[in-house]
């Protein structure tokens, strides 16, 4: 049977394939307590952060620039990795491979879970509702307190302004407003 106003059959759904996407951060923002017991959960996804220390780790640099959070929040592992890649790419083009040391200071221990509930026609036959509502793991996050250091970048005096700019760019990838503190040795 053809619907006049839709120009498609009633029983037939559209043939488009809908891709899975990342859930919005407001679903996980207000968590009150940490959930880190990975032995109870099967299949916790691996962290996206590939390297926590980048650059020359043993050199003695005169400037230390630190990015710290202004507010308490949850920072997802892919946001931390995105901030690290942004800062690393910017400072590496200016200071070279051995002109800096970048360190990510937080680790995403907190396991994020999502109880998917089907919506639309016939969802009551498919969905379990709030029965067995523990949820599937969708990722990990770092629980950040206000004033906590997130990323530290050490470099020489000549690249101090570039280090500050690199951390400013990476702060846009994080879900909280950030402070940038410069310390001279």
Residue locations for each model-derived region?
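Ribosome-associated RNA-binding proteins
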Residues: 2-185
